């Protein structure tokens, strides 16, 4: 099998399947999930064997940036629910209205602060807070791609997605 030049959980079905399977196994491995949830940085995640299961499965089919994937794994440990029928990007989920409110689930100010983040460890903490604001229910492939490929292009895409969905002020 030829190795893909880059990893994408939204564009490559095989990589998406590996990530989903790995995440679903959390339900049967509460100790592993708890170990990942206690980590405060990608550097700490490197010491968790459960992370390496994901890394080793993915490295067979695509080039993997270990630190970026570690951030994905750590943040994924905070995801409680994955609605596979959800076709919205993570940024659109952030912009969706709170139940019974005209306010977005993630405020405009918090979203703009997120887009200003360049430091990987700061991104890690910010995204854990975002997952919590979303009630732990997110689109897993979209979240994973955004974290893995955190750069200007990702930020731009997220901005367009968020502001396409966000309630407008009159």
Give the label of every model feature segment:
Residues 2-5, 9-170:
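Basic, alpha-helical nucleic-acid-binding regions used in initiation and control of genome expression
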